[in-house]
Amino acid sequence: MAYSGAPTIEMPALGRPLRLGMLYDCRSDTLIPGITLWGIEALKKDVETMPKHNTEFQIIASDTIEDKASALRLSSSLKASLLGRLVEVGGSAAFLNDTKKSKYHARVALHYSVTNRFEHLTMSQLGTENVSYPAVFDQGTATHVVTAVLYGAQAFFVFDREVSSSESMREIEGKMKLMIEKIPKVSGGAEVSGEKGNKEEERKENFSCKFYGDFALENNPVTYQDAMGVYSTLPKRLGVAGENAVPVRVWLYPLSKLDSRAAQLVREISAVLVYDAQSALEHLTECDVRCNDMVKDRTATTFPEIQRKIQQFRDLCKQHRQTFQKELARTLPSIRGGGAEEGALVEILTNKEQSPFGTQRLNEFLEKKQEEMDFVNSYLAELGEVEVVSSRSERQCIVLSPRHDFIVSLSLTSLHNEESYLSELNLSLRRQFMKKTHDPALASSACETPKSKQWFEDEEIRRKARQAVKSFSGFARVNKSNGKTRFIVASVPDKDNPGTAIYLYEDGELISTNFEPPSKPRPPLMDGIRHDRVQLTFNPAAYGRAAISGYRAEYRIVGQENWTAVTVNNKQETFTVTGLRANTEYQF
């Protein structure tokens, strides 16, 4: 988008030490220290100062780049430079880099802004005949000069509160907003009506506070009460004559208006491209937040294999973010200075979306990882109080312990499987590095990894896993009081038994990697009924049939409480019960 040639550019100082007469390069949004058009004395002679007193506050109930940029009144162009990390912010503007670390955090920010004076150069300074150092125009390092500065200070109080799964995020944020709106009123001496008592005090205690400001504080506030105390002192901290005020907004005049030899801003970045870059970075932030929550999930902390993969994904995304921002930082000044077209930025954005780091593919990985965690968590819920073992060493201690003759382990066998997508992300980063090092041979060798189905997406594996969990759970319940046998759940890599397998250990030795606990048999069939006997035909369930060593049958006369038990200590599936009373009804 061609530069409109506006006579001046207004922008926030963002904590940077901008002063009247300082040179500025709008192509890279950097200030040029140590080089000026005028001497110090000439600058001081023709500066006009006027009072500009104003105080404002606003509540920011959003954590998006857009709303933060709006609070600081950033232009689209300056926002693009911030996205590419061309601008190092300081003071209150450091608030821009603070994002929520969890989706279970409610966040509301209070923005305080005060101004006290406005300084600007007179028109006599801007005449070419008054320029003390005209060589600046030939150097091409700057495009603009600071001709006006608005002084004051700003502060952001950022309040966070953890929200439990049983609470409403919207409701909590609404209550936080109401309480934070009271701070300027109470600090101003106004009477505020509203909720009183222990409940409100409890809510205040649940807040954490972070402070980003242009004021020098002895101690930063960390609680709601601290914030109220600090807020009430802010007006005095500017000093009696406002001597502690800092630049909050500046106005830049193009050097090309003074001399045509000067470097100039050729074109601006289209707002739609800035928005696309902003969306890409915000999505990476969302992925980071999701990962932060997932690594703390019960399933991830129980099985470190899952946790490690999420952490690896998060680290790869952070590396990609840095690479993407470096590309922006390299390309934006070139476009603005006329050295490249906007198509260069379009190519960067397109390549990102078509790479393994594209929005859809990042979402797919996180959704599948969440699906895997939910799948495993459903096992843990079904198994109730069965002990879960997180490490190999802990499992070995249990297996080798002489306290139990048998260890029956429900083994999750596929949690260690390599993630082809993580390998693909790694390769993508390597390819980008190889291109920078101008090694096409290495770049071409980094081929794309073919997609593969996850273990929990295979219907046959899911079916077998459900059967194994049900069988293991029932077997563990029946044998709960058996002191010779211990039941555990563990993660054990085993490609021969994908998904789940039941391991049986006896006296420290692995006896079976595919143990099928015998299930409760179906009701026996009656045959050969005589006056004093009946033949039972046992009807075992298919699952666990191989592990059956005998049967136990119980019977009683209908109406009586006591049962009589008979045990068959072999695998024969027919047995004759004798000694029954004639003309009597029995229940088996």
Indicate where each model-derived feature is located.
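Long, low-complexity or tandemly repetitive, helically biased scaffold regions used
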Residues: D259-R466
